[in-house]
Protein backbone atom coordinates (compact mmCIF):
# COMPACT_ATOMS: atom_id res chain seq x y z
CA UNK A 1 0.00 0.00 0.00
CA UNK A 2 1.46 3.38 -0.97
CA UNK A 3 -0.48 5.35 1.65
CA UNK A 4 0.95 6.30 5.04
CA UNK A 5 -0.37 4.39 8.04
CA UNK A 6 -0.21 5.04 11.78
CA UNK A 7 3.10 3.15 11.78
CA UNK A 8 4.66 5.96 9.71
CA UNK A 9 3.96 8.89 12.05
CA UNK A 10 4.93 10.01 15.55
CA UNK A 11 1.85 9.74 17.76
CA UNK A 12 3.15 10.48 21.26
CA UNK A 13 1.11 13.20 22.94
CA UNK A 14 -0.81 13.86 19.72
CA UNK A 15 -4.57 14.31 19.55
CA UNK A 16 -5.72 11.73 17.02
CA UNK A 17 -9.13 11.98 15.32
CA UNK A 18 -9.67 8.34 14.39
CA UNK A 19 -12.65 7.57 12.13
CA UNK A 20 -13.79 4.03 12.90
CA UNK A 21 -16.76 2.00 11.69
CA UNK A 22 -18.88 1.34 14.79
CA UNK A 23 -22.07 1.03 12.71
CA UNK A 24 -23.18 -2.08 14.61
CA UNK A 25 -26.65 -3.67 14.59
CA UNK A 26 -28.66 -2.73 17.70
CA UNK A 27 -31.84 -4.10 19.22
CA UNK A 28 -33.53 -2.26 22.08
CA UNK A 29 -30.34 -0.43 23.00
CA UNK A 30 -28.23 -3.61 22.97
CA UNK A 31 -25.50 -4.41 20.44
CA UNK A 32 -26.40 -7.65 18.64
CA UNK A 33 -23.12 -8.08 16.73
CA UNK A 34 -19.88 -6.43 17.86
CA UNK A 35 -17.64 -7.64 14.99
CA UNK A 36 -16.97 -4.09 13.82
CA UNK A 37 -15.95 -2.87 17.28
CA UNK A 38 -13.53 -5.79 17.64
CA UNK A 39 -12.12 -5.13 14.17
CA UNK A 40 -11.03 -1.64 15.28
CA UNK A 41 -9.31 -2.80 18.49
CA UNK A 42 -5.77 -3.33 17.07
CA UNK A 43 -5.68 0.26 15.80
CA UNK A 44 -7.08 1.70 19.04
CA UNK A 45 -4.66 -0.37 21.14
CA UNK A 46 -1.72 0.71 18.98
CA UNK A 47 -2.69 4.39 19.39
CA UNK A 48 -2.97 3.93 23.18
CA UNK A 49 0.43 2.17 23.36
CA UNK A 50 2.06 4.97 21.36
CA UNK A 51 0.80 7.55 23.85
CA UNK A 52 -1.77 9.23 21.62
CA UNK A 53 -4.93 10.93 22.85
CA UNK A 54 -7.50 8.79 21.03
CA UNK A 55 -10.61 10.58 19.78
CA UNK A 56 -12.98 8.13 18.06
CA UNK A 57 -15.64 9.15 15.55
CA UNK A 58 -18.25 6.94 13.87
CA UNK A 59 -21.72 6.90 12.40
CA UNK A 60 -24.50 4.60 13.56
CA UNK A 61 -27.59 3.93 11.48
CA UNK A 62 -29.27 6.61 9.39
CA UNK A 63 -30.31 9.52 11.62
CA UNK A 64 -30.51 11.82 8.54
CA UNK A 65 -28.77 14.86 10.02
CA UNK A 66 -30.53 15.08 13.38
CA UNK A 67 -30.06 13.67 16.87
CA UNK A 68 -31.95 10.39 17.34
CA UNK A 69 -31.84 9.07 20.92
CA UNK A 70 -31.62 5.37 20.05
CA UNK A 71 -28.73 6.03 17.65
CA UNK A 72 -26.41 7.61 20.22
CA UNK A 73 -23.02 5.91 20.55
CA UNK A 74 -23.29 5.58 24.36
CA UNK A 75 -23.76 1.74 24.40
CA UNK A 76 -20.90 1.39 21.91
CA UNK A 77 -18.55 3.46 24.09
CA UNK A 78 -19.52 1.36 27.12
CA UNK A 79 -18.82 -1.92 25.29
CA UNK A 80 -15.53 -0.58 23.93
CA UNK A 81 -14.45 0.23 27.49
CA UNK A 82 -15.16 -3.37 28.50
CA UNK A 83 -13.22 -4.76 25.53
CA UNK A 84 -10.23 -2.46 26.18
CA UNK A 85 -10.40 -2.96 29.94
CA UNK A 86 -10.18 0.78 30.53
CA UNK A 87 -12.29 3.85 31.10
CA UNK A 88 -13.69 5.24 27.84
CA UNK A 89 -15.30 8.68 27.95
CA UNK A 90 -18.25 9.62 25.76
CA UNK A 91 -19.03 13.12 24.48
CA UNK A 92 -22.64 14.13 23.76
CA UNK A 93 -21.48 16.19 20.77
CA UNK A 94 -19.11 15.41 17.88
CA UNK A 95 -17.49 18.89 17.87
CA UNK A 96 -17.78 22.31 19.52
CA UNK A 97 -17.04 23.60 23.05
CA UNK A 98 -18.20 20.47 24.96
CA UNK A 99 -16.07 18.14 22.82
CA UNK A 100 -13.12 20.57 22.90
CA UNK A 101 -13.22 20.76 26.69
CA UNK A 102 -13.21 16.96 26.98
CA UNK A 103 -10.30 16.69 24.53
CA UNK A 104 -8.35 19.35 26.47
CA UNK A 105 -8.71 17.25 29.63
CA UNK A 106 -7.28 14.09 27.99
CA UNK A 107 -3.98 12.50 28.98
CA UNK A 108 -1.77 10.32 26.78
CA UNK A 109 -3.47 6.95 26.19
CA UNK A 110 -6.97 8.22 27.03
CA UNK A 111 -9.91 7.28 24.80
CA UNK A 112 -12.89 9.51 23.99
CA UNK A 113 -15.85 8.53 21.78
CA UNK A 114 -17.56 11.44 20.02
CA UNK A 115 -21.30 11.46 19.29
CA UNK A 116 -22.71 9.93 16.08
CA UNK A 117 -21.31 12.06 13.23
CA UNK A 118 -24.46 11.58 11.15
CA UNK A 119 -26.46 13.62 13.69
CA UNK A 120 -25.12 16.58 11.68
CA UNK A 121 -26.49 17.29 8.19
CA UNK A 122 -23.05 18.40 7.00
CA UNK A 123 -21.50 14.95 7.47
CA UNK A 124 -22.99 13.22 4.43
CA UNK A 125 -22.71 16.42 2.35
CA UNK A 126 -18.96 16.49 3.08
CA UNK A 127 -19.45 20.03 4.36
CA UNK A 128 -16.14 21.92 4.66
CA UNK A 129 -17.21 23.83 7.79
CA UNK A 130 -18.05 20.60 9.63
CA UNK A 131 -14.80 19.00 8.46
CA UNK A 132 -12.93 22.03 9.91
CA UNK A 133 -14.78 21.62 13.22
CA UNK A 134 -13.71 17.97 13.40
CA UNK A 135 -10.14 18.92 12.49
CA UNK A 136 -10.05 21.56 15.24
CA UNK A 137 -10.18 18.74 17.82
CA UNK A 138 -7.01 17.01 16.66
CA UNK A 139 -3.44 17.03 15.31
CA UNK A 140 -3.70 13.95 13.07
CA UNK A 141 -6.53 12.25 11.14
CA UNK A 142 -6.58 8.45 11.04
CA UNK A 143 -9.08 6.68 8.79
CA UNK A 144 -9.72 3.12 9.94
CA UNK A 145 -13.30 2.92 8.64
CA UNK A 146 -12.89 0.79 5.53
CA UNK A 147 -16.64 0.10 5.63
CA UNK A 148 -17.26 3.81 4.94
CA UNK A 149 -14.26 4.41 2.65
CA UNK A 150 -16.45 4.62 -0.45
CA UNK A 151 -18.22 7.64 1.03
CA UNK A 152 -16.93 11.18 0.59
CA UNK A 153 -18.19 12.49 3.95
CA UNK A 154 -16.84 15.15 6.31
CA UNK A 155 -15.39 12.62 8.79
CA UNK A 156 -14.09 10.14 6.17
CA UNK A 157 -12.58 12.47 3.57
CA UNK A 158 -13.25 16.20 4.12
CA UNK A 159 -11.27 16.38 7.36
CA UNK A 160 -8.13 15.26 5.49
CA UNK A 161 -7.96 18.72 3.87
CA UNK A 162 -7.03 20.20 7.26
CA UNK A 163 -4.88 17.56 8.99
CA UNK A 164 -2.11 15.08 8.16
CA UNK A 165 -4.06 11.94 7.13
CA UNK A 166 -2.99 8.30 7.54
CA UNK A 167 -4.67 4.89 7.58
CA UNK A 168 -5.31 2.73 10.61
CA UNK A 169 -4.24 -0.93 10.78
CA UNK A 170 -7.61 -2.33 9.65
CA UNK A 171 -7.76 0.00 6.65
CA UNK A 172 -4.15 -0.90 5.82
CA UNK A 173 -4.91 -4.63 5.97
CA UNK A 174 -8.05 -4.32 3.83
CA UNK A 175 -6.20 -2.35 1.14
CA UNK A 176 -3.25 -4.76 1.19
CA UNK A 177 -5.36 -7.92 0.89
CA UNK A 178 -7.83 -6.61 -1.69
CA UNK A 179 -5.12 -4.73 -3.57
CA UNK A 180 -2.92 -7.81 -3.85
CA UNK A 181 -5.89 -9.92 -4.95
CA UNK A 182 -6.60 -7.56 -7.82
CA UNK A 183 -3.12 -6.51 -8.90
CA UNK A 184 -1.03 -9.62 -8.35
CA UNK A 185 -3.27 -12.63 -7.65
CA UNK A 186 -2.06 -16.15 -7.06
CA UNK A 187 -3.48 -18.44 -9.73
CA UNK A 188 -5.84 -20.09 -10.40
CA UNK A 189 -7.85 -17.05 -9.23
CA UNK A 190 -11.61 -17.61 -8.83
CA UNK A 191 -14.33 -15.04 -8.18
CA UNK A 192 -17.70 -16.16 -6.83
CA UNK A 193 -20.41 -13.59 -7.52
CA UNK A 194 -23.86 -14.04 -6.00
CA UNK A 195 -26.62 -11.92 -4.54
CA UNK A 196 -29.97 -10.87 -5.88
CA UNK A 197 -29.34 -8.34 -8.63
CA UNK A 198 -27.19 -8.24 -11.74
CA UNK A 199 -27.28 -4.43 -11.69
CA UNK A 200 -25.43 -4.33 -8.34
CA UNK A 201 -22.64 -6.54 -9.70
CA UNK A 202 -22.20 -5.26 -13.28
CA UNK A 203 -19.10 -3.23 -12.42
CA UNK A 204 -17.45 -6.00 -10.45
CA UNK A 205 -18.13 -8.72 -13.07
CA UNK A 206 -16.79 -6.47 -15.83
CA UNK A 207 -13.64 -5.59 -13.86
CA UNK A 208 -12.98 -9.18 -12.70
CA UNK A 209 -13.35 -10.71 -16.17
CA UNK A 210 -9.94 -9.11 -16.91
CA UNK A 211 -8.37 -10.64 -13.79
CA UNK A 212 -9.78 -14.08 -12.98
CA UNK A 213 -9.30 -17.60 -14.33
CA UNK A 214 -12.74 -18.76 -13.13
CA UNK A 215 -15.97 -16.85 -12.58
CA UNK A 216 -18.72 -18.59 -10.61
CA UNK A 217 -22.26 -17.20 -10.69
CA UNK A 218 -24.99 -17.92 -8.13
CA UNK A 219 -27.81 -16.29 -6.19
CA UNK A 220 -30.81 -14.49 -7.67
CA UNK A 221 -28.72 -12.82 -10.36
CA UNK A 222 -27.95 -16.23 -11.92
CA UNK A 223 -31.46 -16.53 -13.40
CA UNK A 224 -30.93 -13.57 -15.71
CA UNK A 225 -27.95 -15.49 -17.14
CA UNK A 226 -30.00 -18.71 -17.32
CA UNK A 227 -32.70 -16.87 -19.25
CA UNK A 228 -30.03 -15.37 -21.51
CA UNK A 229 -29.14 -18.95 -22.49
CA UNK A 230 -32.75 -19.40 -23.63
CA UNK A 231 -34.13 -21.38 -20.66
CA UNK A 232 -37.49 -20.75 -18.99
CA UNK A 233 -37.04 -19.65 -15.36
CA UNK A 234 -40.62 -19.67 -14.02
CA UNK A 235 -41.11 -17.03 -11.32
CA UNK A 236 -37.40 -16.73 -10.51
CA UNK A 237 -35.83 -13.29 -10.16
CA UNK A 238 -34.98 -11.84 -13.55
CA UNK A 239 -33.88 -8.47 -14.84
CA UNK A 240 -35.15 -8.50 -18.41
CA UNK A 241 -33.30 -5.29 -19.21
CA UNK A 242 -30.01 -7.03 -18.32
CA UNK A 243 -30.38 -10.15 -20.52
CA UNK A 244 -28.33 -8.69 -23.38
CA UNK A 245 -25.64 -7.68 -20.89
CA UNK A 246 -25.58 -11.23 -19.48
CA UNK A 247 -25.02 -12.56 -23.01
CA UNK A 248 -22.25 -10.01 -23.49
CA UNK A 249 -20.52 -11.12 -20.25
CA UNK A 250 -20.66 -14.79 -21.27
CA UNK A 251 -19.20 -13.91 -24.67
CA UNK A 252 -16.47 -11.78 -23.05
CA UNK A 253 -15.54 -14.65 -20.74
CA UNK A 254 -15.14 -16.92 -23.76
CA UNK A 255 -12.96 -14.38 -25.57
CA UNK A 256 -10.76 -13.83 -22.51
CA UNK A 257 -10.40 -17.55 -21.77
CA UNK A 258 -12.22 -17.27 -18.44
CA UNK A 259 -14.11 -20.38 -17.28
CA UNK A 260 -17.66 -19.15 -16.66
CA UNK A 261 -19.57 -21.38 -14.23
CA UNK A 262 -23.34 -21.24 -13.87
CA UNK A 263 -25.81 -23.44 -12.00
CA UNK A 264 -26.65 -26.75 -13.71
CA UNK A 265 -29.40 -27.54 -11.20
CA UNK A 266 -31.38 -25.43 -8.74
CA UNK A 267 -33.59 -25.67 -5.67
CA UNK A 268 -37.09 -24.43 -6.50
CA UNK A 269 -40.12 -23.60 -4.38
CA UNK A 270 -43.69 -22.36 -4.71
CA UNK A 271 -43.66 -20.47 -1.43
CA UNK A 272 -41.18 -18.29 0.36
CA UNK A 273 -41.06 -19.58 3.95
CA UNK A 274 -39.09 -21.54 6.56
CA UNK A 275 -41.34 -24.57 5.99
CA UNK A 276 -41.44 -24.39 2.20
CA UNK A 277 -41.63 -27.52 0.07
CA UNK A 278 -38.70 -27.62 -2.33
CA UNK A 279 -37.67 -29.64 -5.37
CA UNK A 280 -34.38 -29.99 -7.20
CA UNK A 281 -34.54 -29.62 -10.99
CA UNK A 282 -32.16 -29.17 -13.89
CA UNK A 283 -31.68 -25.61 -15.06
CA UNK A 284 -33.83 -26.30 -18.14
CA UNK A 285 -36.80 -27.70 -16.17
CA UNK A 286 -38.10 -24.91 -13.90
CA UNK A 287 -41.96 -25.05 -13.94
CA UNK A 288 -43.78 -21.81 -14.71
CA UNK A 289 -45.24 -21.30 -11.20
CA UNK A 290 -42.06 -22.15 -9.25
CA UNK A 291 -39.01 -20.03 -8.52
CA UNK A 292 -35.33 -20.81 -8.09
CA UNK A 293 -34.05 -20.00 -4.59
CA UNK A 294 -30.68 -21.79 -4.31
CA UNK A 295 -28.09 -23.73 -6.30
CA UNK A 296 -28.66 -27.49 -6.47
CA UNK A 297 -26.42 -30.37 -5.24
CA UNK A 298 -24.69 -31.02 -8.60
CA UNK A 299 -23.83 -27.33 -8.89
CA UNK A 300 -22.50 -27.31 -5.31
CA UNK A 301 -20.14 -30.18 -6.18
CA UNK A 302 -18.86 -28.47 -9.33
CA UNK A 303 -18.32 -25.17 -7.49
CA UNK A 304 -16.59 -26.92 -4.56
CA UNK A 305 -14.23 -28.62 -7.00
CA UNK A 306 -13.29 -25.30 -8.65
CA UNK A 307 -12.72 -23.74 -5.21
CA UNK A 308 -10.53 -26.63 -4.06
CA UNK A 309 -8.29 -26.21 -7.11
CA UNK A 310 -7.92 -22.43 -6.74
CA UNK A 311 -5.10 -20.57 -5.01
CA UNK A 312 -7.17 -17.43 -4.45
CA UNK A 313 -10.94 -17.07 -4.14
CA UNK A 314 -12.85 -13.81 -3.75
CA UNK A 315 -16.47 -14.34 -2.71
CA UNK A 316 -19.10 -11.62 -2.97
CA UNK A 317 -22.78 -12.50 -2.56
CA UNK A 318 -24.69 -15.60 -1.39
CA UNK A 319 -25.81 -18.52 -3.61
CA UNK A 320 -29.42 -18.47 -2.43
CA UNK A 321 -31.79 -17.07 0.18
CA UNK A 322 -29.51 -18.30 2.98
CA UNK A 323 -31.53 -16.53 5.69
CA UNK A 324 -34.16 -19.30 5.33
CA UNK A 325 -33.13 -22.85 6.23
CA UNK A 326 -34.58 -24.66 3.17
CA UNK A 327 -32.70 -22.32 0.81
CA UNK A 328 -29.38 -22.10 2.68
CA UNK A 329 -27.56 -25.25 1.56
CA UNK A 330 -25.87 -23.78 -1.53
CA UNK A 331 -24.35 -20.86 0.34
CA UNK A 332 -23.33 -23.21 3.16
CA UNK A 333 -21.68 -25.59 0.67
CA UNK A 334 -19.59 -22.80 -0.86
CA UNK A 335 -18.57 -21.68 2.64
CA UNK A 336 -17.68 -25.26 3.56
CA UNK A 337 -15.61 -25.71 0.40
CA UNK A 338 -13.65 -22.56 1.27
CA UNK A 339 -13.24 -23.70 4.88
CA UNK A 340 -11.92 -27.10 3.72
CA UNK A 341 -9.60 -25.78 0.98
CA UNK A 342 -6.21 -25.82 2.69
CA UNK A 343 -4.13 -24.22 -0.07
CA UNK A 344 -6.67 -21.55 -0.96
CA UNK A 345 -6.53 -17.94 0.24
CA UNK A 346 -10.16 -16.88 0.75
CA UNK A 347 -11.32 -13.28 0.70
CA UNK A 348 -14.93 -12.73 1.78
CA UNK A 349 -16.21 -9.44 0.39
CA UNK A 350 -18.22 -8.15 3.32
CA UNK A 351 -21.98 -7.72 3.42
CA UNK A 352 -24.14 -10.83 3.00
CA UNK A 353 -21.24 -13.22 2.33
CA UNK A 354 -19.64 -12.18 5.62
CA UNK A 355 -22.99 -12.57 7.40
CA UNK A 356 -23.36 -16.06 5.91
CA UNK A 357 -19.95 -17.38 7.04
CA UNK A 358 -20.64 -15.90 10.49
CA UNK A 359 -24.06 -17.57 10.60
CA UNK A 360 -22.66 -20.98 9.64
CA UNK A 361 -19.78 -20.72 12.14
CA UNK A 362 -17.09 -20.75 9.43
CA UNK A 363 -15.65 -17.26 9.95
CA UNK A 364 -12.45 -18.43 11.63
CA UNK A 365 -11.68 -20.70 8.66
CA UNK A 366 -11.60 -17.81 6.16
CA UNK A 367 -8.31 -16.07 5.36
CA UNK A 368 -9.77 -12.56 5.25
CA UNK A 369 -13.28 -11.27 5.86
CA UNK A 370 -13.69 -7.73 4.60
CA UNK A 371 -15.41 -5.29 6.95
CA UNK A 372 -16.85 -3.29 4.05
CA UNK A 373 -19.72 -4.50 1.87
CA UNK A 374 -20.16 -1.50 -0.43
CA UNK A 375 -16.53 -0.42 -0.06
CA UNK A 376 -15.07 -3.80 -1.02
CA UNK A 377 -17.49 -4.03 -3.96
CA UNK A 378 -16.43 -0.61 -5.28
CA UNK A 379 -12.77 -1.48 -4.71
CA UNK A 380 -13.27 -4.68 -6.73
CA UNK A 381 -14.89 -2.61 -9.48
CA UNK A 382 -11.60 -0.74 -9.75
CA UNK A 383 -13.05 2.49 -8.38
CA UNK A 384 -11.04 4.90 -6.26
CA UNK A 385 -12.37 5.19 -2.70
CA UNK A 386 -12.64 8.79 -1.39
CA UNK A 387 -11.65 7.71 2.15
CA UNK A 388 -8.41 6.26 0.74
CA UNK A 389 -7.54 8.83 -1.94
CA UNK A 390 -7.48 11.56 0.75
CA UNK A 391 -4.71 9.86 2.78
CA UNK A 392 -1.10 11.05 2.57
CA UNK A 393 1.19 9.13 0.22
CA UNK A 394 4.29 7.44 1.58
From Swiss-Prot:
- BP terms from Gene Ontology: gluconeogenesis; glycolytic process
Its UniProt entry gives the catalysed reaction(s) as: (2R)-3-phosphoglycerate + ATP = (2R)-3-phospho-glyceroyl phosphate + ADP
Q: What is its EC number?
A: 2.7.2.3
Modification type Phosphoserine: residues: 183
UniProt keyword DNA repair, yes or no: no
Positions annotated to bind ATP = 201, 292, 323, 350-353
Record InterPro entries: Phosphoglycerate_kinase, Phosphoglycerate_kinase_CS, Phosphoglycerate_kinase_N, Phosphoglycerate_kinase_sf
| Gene Ontology molecular function terms on file | ADP binding; ATP binding; phosphoglycerate kinase activity
| Pathway linked to the protein | Carbohydrate degradation; glycolysis; pyruvate from D-glyceraldehyde 3-phosphate: step 2/5
Against PROSITE patterns, the record matches this protein to: PGLYCERATE_KINASE
Question: Which sites bind substrate?
Answer: 21-23, 36, 59-62, 118, 151
Q: Where in the cell is it found?
A: Cytoplasm
Quaternary structure, per UniProt, is: Monomer.
Concerning its family, UniProt says:
Belongs to the phosphoglycerate kinase family.
Its recorded name reads Phosphoglycerate kinase
